[in-house]
């Protein structure tokens, strides 16, 4: 599908608050050029500012909460809308996310109603130079449509990008590009996008999100094995461990392109992954395929930073 063919339809009755994760810790692997990625410039603009501006321009977004080093964030986001709230970081990813969730909940509390666990929030990373208001609105609309179609109040929607939406960012005609590994499902090749819609209070095992984030680089077998080990002893852990190893083995088999690969891929369904993730997280999970591949192109390392800067003018119009 062409990203221009957006499906802007009625989503939820009210706009969603957005949480932008712009925090950092002392781990140098989380930084690029020794810096918090939020404050890098791509295309002549600081990344976190670019993300915030896209969110503020999206019709489906209400308030935007940015969590990170508050003093530095105020400097680069000075002069932005009253719909922007800066939240000081308190620790690692999950702790920072909850600091922003609490700030959002505090803004919507009224009388004795208390916190509404059914209220969805958008959660997104700060280092997405190819984000746009249209892409954000489209993703939220797809989440709402999936929910309406199944009559299920999902706890978590996770964005995934398909190969067709990422081919345009490959190296071509002597120009640099970005090509990353995919998860090989029976119907398509997918990779995670850095955008989610969540009802965080409906996830009873949220602590696993931090574990998954720490070991998310599946191209490193040490991370894969560490992730699999973290599953064991949890509800649904053995099934999730087996599925993770199967998906990784399918990726390895794809390099040979023979019968074993075709057989393994045939059994890899997105629905199985959704059920396994839901069991681990203690909630219902739905993966949403976005036609906007830019959600998957974060500034992962210094090479990505260089390529995204070099190709920004070409790619920002896609």
Language-model region placement:
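Short, acidic, metal-binding catalytic loop of nucleotide-sugar glycosyltransferases
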Residues: 54-61
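Short phosphate-binding loop-to-helix
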Residues: 78-120, 130-131, 138
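N-terminal nucleotide-binding beta1-loop-alpha1 segment
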Residues: 1-33
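Short, polar loop motifs at secondary-structure junctions
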Residues: 67-73
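Short catalytic helix/loop segments, enriched in acidic residues and glycine
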Residues: 34-52
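Active-site acidic Asp-centered loop
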Residues: 124-126
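Conserved core of the sugar-phosphate nucleotidyltransferase
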Residues: 133-278, 290-293
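ATP/nucleoside-binding phosphotransfer catalytic cores, i.e., glycine-rich phosphate-binding loops
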Residues: 271-318
């Amino acid at each position: 599908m062409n990203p221009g063919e957006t499906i802007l339809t009625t989503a939820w009755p009210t706009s969603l608050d957005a949480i932008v994760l712009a925090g950092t810790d002392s781990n140098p692997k989380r930084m690029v050029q020794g810096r918090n990625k939020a404050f890098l410039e791509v295309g002549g603009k600081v990344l976190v500012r670019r993300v915030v501006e896209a969110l503020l321009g999206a019709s489906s977004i209400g308030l935007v909460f940015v969590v990170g080093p508050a003093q530095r964030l105020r400097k680069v986001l000075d002069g932005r809308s009253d719909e922007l709230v800066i939240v000081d970081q308190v620790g690692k990813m999950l702790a920072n996310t909850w600091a922003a969730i609490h700030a959002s909940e505090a803004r919507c509390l009224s009388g004795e109603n208390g916190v509404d666990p059914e209220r969805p929030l958008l959660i997104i990373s700060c280092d997405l130079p190819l984000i746009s208001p249209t892409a954000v609105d489209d993703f939220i609309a797809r989440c709402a449509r999936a929910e309406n179609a199944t009559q299920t109040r999902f706890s978590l929607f996770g964005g995934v990008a398909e190969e067709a939406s990422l081919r345009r960012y490959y190296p071509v005609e002597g120009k640099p590009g970005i090509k990353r590994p995919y998860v090989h499902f029976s119907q398509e090749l997918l990779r995670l996008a850095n955008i989610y819609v969540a009802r965080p209070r409906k996830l009873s095992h949220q602590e696993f999100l931090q574990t998954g984030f720490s070991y998310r680089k599946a191209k490193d077998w040490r991370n894969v094995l560490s992730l699999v080990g973290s599953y064991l002893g949890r509800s649904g852990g053995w099934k999730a461990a087996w599925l993770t190893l199967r998906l990784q083995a399918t990726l390895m088999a794809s390099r040979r392109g023979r019968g074993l690969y075709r057989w393994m891929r045939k059994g890899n369904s997105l629905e199985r992954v959704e059920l396994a993730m839901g069991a681990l997280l203690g909630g219902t999970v739905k993966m949403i395929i976005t036609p906007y591949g830019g959600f998957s192109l974060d500034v992962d390392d210094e090479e990505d930073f260089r390529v995204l800067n070099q190709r920004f003018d070409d790619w920002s119009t896609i």
